[in-house]
Amino acid sequence: MGSMIEFARNGQRLGGYAAKPEGAGPFPAVIVIQEWWGLNEHIKNVAERYAREGYVALAPDLYRGKVTADPNEAGKLMGALNREEAVKDLLGAIQHLRAMKEVRGDRIGVTGFCMGGSYALLLPCRTKEIRAAAPYYGEIPDEAALRNLACPILYVYGDADFWITKDEVKRLEASLKKLGQAGEVKIYPGAPHAFFNDTRKDVYRQTEAQDAWRRTLDFFAKHLKA
């Protein structure tokens, strides 16, 4: 169902994993942003799951082919990733999707996990071309950035997360309310960071992950399929 592709962004070539539903479309689309491990089989599988639900899914390869299962190496890769260049990669992914005949160009969403969750929340603060965003346990921008949030969000979080604090999530909720931004924060008691990743038995929580998936599908259906 899916395969590696290349697409252009600002004159550069960037790789990514694309998965499409069966049929001619046009379909809504979802950008799937990797964890700090890189574009691994788990992220490719998530893209394929979205395709089975009727979305064209594109997971950009932000690390340019580098993938690891070692936390120390993952930290180095994430630390070496230039945030503004990564945003340009994601903006390029949007333009690639908008140019595809199989895609409804005004129905593009974004999701991401861990590091990817950070970018999935930042991206709709940088462009109005994202219709809905579902960041999972990502870093939260400051209020000045959130002021530019251009779409509804569903922020998914487990309150046993060692990376993102409960206070940060409360700050997000308060900022959304203060700014009048459309958003929901779903908190899973006792769920750790990366609880959605079913390839990591140390942190995967099946019940919470399945519920988060259902909620995310409902959220995207409301904003991307309507």
Named regions from a protein language model:
Residues L149, Y155-Y157:
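Short beta-strand/loop motif that positions the catalytic acidic residue
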Residues K177-A226:
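C-terminal catalytic histidine-bearing segment of alpha/beta-hydrolase fold enzymes
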Residues M4-V103, N197-R200:
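Serine-hydrolase catalytic machinery in alpha/beta-hydrolase-like enzymes
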Residues L58-A59, P135, V185:
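Hydrophobic residues in well-ordered beta-strands that form the structural core
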Residues L91-A150:
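Primarily recognizes the serine-hydrolase "nucleophile elbow" in alpha/beta-hydrolase
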Residues L62-G65, E139, A191:
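Short beta-to-alpha linker loops that shape the active-site pocket of alpha/beta-hydrolase fold enzymes
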Residues T165-S175:
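Short alpha-helix in the alpha/beta-hydrolase fold that links the catalytic acid
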